């Protein structure tokens, strides 16, 4: 059914200064290159990003290049999902990198726990230059490799809101897609939509997603709290509205995480 073991979706937009580091980290992955495809999806870049993608694709068979009109990261990821041919799907932003054994470790873990979970996560390590920043508080809960019950009071505050994840490829027309109507929290909603059936999450302690925290990111701009309210209240109403009576503790913890 699947041509590859792992599909990596890389949305690309005006990232020529960082893109080579991202792609080189994928070339260093220890997973067999016959089991790997990387979808480089250019979202209407105005710089030399598309040219870099094409150069790598000419040299290395794992890379596949697509060029779209600018539609935003959610639409770009959805295009990637719909064109993925791997059993598992993971995501990497074009200015970020993965440690060398990430994809193989995550795929092996998923193989062992396939029926228990729909999503595997691993550490996201924010950095800029030589400086590494504090890890998210969820890693005080996620200490060991394993499967965690998100309805357990001890683990409901794990709050997976970022794209250091791997999910199953359910096949054409069956995969969860990103909500293109959201200006914020599209990652958070996507993760919850994938997790909501089993409410369990897999965690691999050794792989790392190295997140480049560049100056001027969206989350650092003034007025962010205002835009969260204006752009995401409908999202919360829809998500809470799925349940009559008991709302999963994990969903409640996501909301608390936002308002804090």
Identify the role of each PLM range.
Residues 89:
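Short aromatic/hydrophobic "clamp" motif used to bind/position activated sugar donors
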Residues 134-157:
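Short, flexible, basic/aromatic active-site loop/helix in glycosyltransferases
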Residues 68-84:
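Glycine-rich, basic loop-to-helix element that forms the pyrophosphate-binding segment
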Residues 182-183, 203-235, 250:
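Nucleotide-sugar-dependent glycosyltransferase catalytic core
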Residues 15-29:
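Short, well-formed alpha-helical segments that are part of the catalytic scaffolds
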Residues 101-136:
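Conserved donor NDP-sugar-binding/catalytic core segment of glycosyltransferases
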Residues 25, 42-51:
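A conserved acidic beta->alpha catalytic loop
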Residues 184-190:
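Acidic donor-binding loop at a coil-to-helix junction in glycosyltransferase catalytic cores
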């Amino acid at each position: 059914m699947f041509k590859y073991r792992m599909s990596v979706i890389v949305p690309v937009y005006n990232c020529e200064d960082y893109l080579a580091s991202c792609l080189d980290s994928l070339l260093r992955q220890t997973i067999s290159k016959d089991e790997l495809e990387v979808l480089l999806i250019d979202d209407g870049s105005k710089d030399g990003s598309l040219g870099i993608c094409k150069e790598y694709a000419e040299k290395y068979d794992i890379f596949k290049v697509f060029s779209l009109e600018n539609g935003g990261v959610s639409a770009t990821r959805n295009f990637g999902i719909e064109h993925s041919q791997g059993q598992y799907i993971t995501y990497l932003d074009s200015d970020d990198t993965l440690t060398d054994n990430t994809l193989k470790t995550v795929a092996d873990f998923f193989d062992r726990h396939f029926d228990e979970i729909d999503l595997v996560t691993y550490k996201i390590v924010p950095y800029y230059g030589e400086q590494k920043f504090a890890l998210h508080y969820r890693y005080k809960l996620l200490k060991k490799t394993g499967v965690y019950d998100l309805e357990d009071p001890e683990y409901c505050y794990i709050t997976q809101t970022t794209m250091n994840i791997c999910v199953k490829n359910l096949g054409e027309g069956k995969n969860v897609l990103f909500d293109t109507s959201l200006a914020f929290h599209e990652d958070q909603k996507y993760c919850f939509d994938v997790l909501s059936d089993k409410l369990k999450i897999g965690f691999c302690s050794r792989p790392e997603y190295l997140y480049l925290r560049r100056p001027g990111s969206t989350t650092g701009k003034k007025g962010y709290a205002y835009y969260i309210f204006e752009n995401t209240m409908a999202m919360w109403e829809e998500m809470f509205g799925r349940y009559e009576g008991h709302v999963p503790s994990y969903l409640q913890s996501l909301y608390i995480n936002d308002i804090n």
